[in-house]
Regions:
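Extracellular/lumen-exposed scaffold segments
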Residues: 19-156
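Sec-dependent N-terminal signal peptides
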Residues: 4-14
C-alpha cells in the first residue's frame, strides 16, 4: 500500500511540476544604437520584477555570480573598452551575508563599438546573470542575442 501511495504521489508531483512554467523574473533585450560618425553602442537592458534583483559586473568573493557579457569578434567592428553599467546600488544580501552591488527594477549595460564598414551585419552576443530575491536565488542563466547593425550604422 505504501508503495502504491509513493508511486502515485511521485507521478502527481511530476505532472504538477511539469505544468508550471519556469520562474522568469528578468526580461532582457539587446539593441544597437548609433552614437557618432564612426560607431555606436550595444545596449543590453534588463527589466526586473519587483522584489528581485541581478548582480553588477563587479566580481565578489562571497558568492553571487556577477553579470557578464561576451561579444563574438567580427571583421565588421571592433570593441571599444569594456561593457559599462549604469549605477548599481550596494545592498546587504542575507544569503551571502555580505554587501554586494545589485540592480533592481532595471539595469542598462553598454558596449561601445567602432564600425569598420557601413554595410548591414549582425553582432552575436551572450550574457550570463543570476537572479535573486530575499528568499531564493535562481540558477545562473545564459542568453544569446543577434544584434542587427543596419546599413550605414554610424550616426550622420
Amino acid at each position: 500500500m505504501n508503495r502504491i501511495f509513493l508511486i502515485l504521489f511521485s507521478l502527481l508531483s511530476f505532472v504538477g511540476f511539469s505544468q508550471n512554467p519556469p520562474l522568469k523574473h528578468v526580461t532582457w533585450n539587446a539593441v544597437y544604437v548609433a552614437t557618432n560618425a564612426t560607431g555606436g553602442e550595444i545596449h543590453f537592458t534588463a527589466t526586473i520584477d519587483k522584489k528581485w534583483h541581478i548582480y553588477s559586473q563587479r566580481p565578489t568573493d562571497v558568492g553571487p555570480i556577477p553579470t557578464s557579457f561576451t561579444v563574438t569578434p567580427s571583421a565588421d567592428f571592433e570593441l571599444v573598452g569594456k561593457v559599462e553599467e549604469e549605477q548599481a546600488h550596494e545592498e546587504y544580501v542575507a544569503a551571502f551575508e555580505a554587501k554586494v552591488f545589485v540592480f533592481s527594477n532595471q539595469a542598462v549595460f553598454k558596449q561601445k563599438i567602432k564600425l569598420k564598414n557601413q554595410k548591414s551585419f549582425t553582432i552575436k552576443t551572450s550574457l550570463e546573470f543570476m537572479t535573486c530575491n530575499d528568499v531564493q536565488c535562481l540558477p545562473p542563466a545564459t542568453l544569446e542575442f543577434q544584434v542587427l547593425v543596419p546599413e550605414g550604422g554610424a550616426k550622420k
